[in-house]
């Protein structure tokens, strides 16, 4: 096959073999040729500052030499075994040491898979079926997760709205939807429904911050109504702090999911909880009826584990998170100055380590208020 060099030719080839022309729903309209540090280059050689960082995994930048060295050291020893391996065990130990709610973990390949198993685990542990999630919260591509992620029409809470074709109608009956940052709505739903297994939440929902006391309130309500609290830390884990949102906000869930950074740029995710909850993965303890089957071809593979271990080691070094926050503050200030100078109304929402710009004058407290953003900008 001819070695094509121009970006337009590569885009045409992509459109021929991929539905909608890309790997997923997100298509930036460029073809990335390589990355180094905080920059990526397209097939035409154009240099971009990469604020996407692979949607989160590349927090250290592209091609970090220590991560490359760790991967190259593991490669000749084996790439995957479908069995326990030393690197996977070491990574699990590092996660248990770092993340407050984790006494034990299970590895999977993607964050969406981790969230799917977290929901299933909550149901197995409690014997209940319903899940409360927040409108606009992203938890992967499972049927439950694709409820009220990005609804185009507003319906009355707590009605769930599917965001994708192919989801059986019965799934919505097992989901309750609440607005983010609304403890009163959550308490009302808990009081009116005795079949709720868990509340699943992003501690920082996309880039909408939790209002002061909201996460603490969720924890208290879950304790009062004997409902499990799941933190989806696929994005926030090892990013807001080394111990993730749990360390940063001082709130410990019952179950959490992790991904992105823990794989160091390779496919790897995990879910973790107390040993009491995680025992449902052990048939010898809970028996067949309460056992949760879970396995995956590449789960815990040593290449991803080696990359993740080295990434976590680097992040744990003194000054890593203070530098990350200083950089984030500087970027926020520069963005605000530029937009204010142009007379453009805006809000910078999120955390110093993870943020975005909304072109609106009102506060962003939940999905519906964020929708007031001007998409044309």
Label the predicted regions:
Residues 1-377:
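Conserved N-terminal phosphate-binding loop of PLP-dependent enzymes in the Aspartate aminotransferase
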């Amino acid at each position: 096959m001819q070695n094509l060099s121009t970006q337009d030719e590569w885009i045409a080839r992509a459109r021929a073999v991929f539905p909608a022309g890309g790997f997923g729903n997100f298509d930036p309209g460029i073809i990335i040729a390589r990355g180094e540090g905080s920059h990526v280059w397209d097939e035409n050689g154009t240099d971009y500052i990469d604020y996407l960082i692979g949607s989160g995994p590349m927090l250290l930048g592209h091609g970090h030499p220590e991560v490359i060295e760790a991967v190259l050291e593991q490669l000749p020893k084996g790439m995957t075994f479908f069995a326990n391996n030393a690197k996977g065990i070491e990574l699990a130990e590092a996660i248990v040491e770092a993340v407050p709610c984790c006494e034990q973990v299970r590895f999977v390949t993607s964050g969406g898979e981790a969230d799917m198993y977290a929901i299933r685990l909550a149901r197995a542990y409690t014997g209940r079926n319903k899940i409360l999630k927040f409108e606009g919260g992203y938890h992967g591509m499972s049927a439950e997760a694709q409820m009220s992620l990005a609804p185009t029409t507003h319906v009355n809470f707590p009605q769930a709205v599917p965001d994708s074709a192919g989801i059986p109608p019965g799934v919505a009956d097992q989901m309750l939807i609440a607005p983010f940052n609304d403890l009163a709505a959550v308490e009302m739903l808990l009081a009116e429904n005795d079949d709720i297994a868990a509340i699943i939440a992003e501690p920082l929902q996309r880039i909408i911050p939790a209002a002061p006391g909201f996460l603490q309130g969720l924890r208290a309500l879950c304790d009062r109504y004997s409902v499990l609290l799941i933190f989806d830390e696929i994005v926030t884990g090892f990013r807001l702090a080394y111990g993730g949102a749990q360390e940063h906000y001082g709130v410990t869930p019952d179950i959490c999911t992790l991904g992105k950074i823990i794989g160091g740029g390779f496919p790897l995710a995990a879910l973790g909880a107390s040993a009491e909850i995680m025992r449902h993965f052990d048939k010898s303890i809970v028996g067949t009826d309460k056992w949760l089957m879970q396995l995956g071809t590449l789960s815990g593979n040593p290449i991803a584990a080696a990359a993740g271990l080295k990434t976590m080691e680097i992040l744990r070094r003194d000054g890593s998170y203070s530098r990350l926050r200083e950089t984030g503050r500087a970027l926020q200030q520069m963005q605000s100055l530029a937009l204010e100078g142009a007379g453009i109304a805006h809000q910078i929402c999120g955390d110093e380590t993870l943020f975005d710009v909304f072109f609106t004058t009102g506060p962003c407290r939940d999905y519906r208020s964020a929708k007031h953003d001007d998409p044309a900008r």
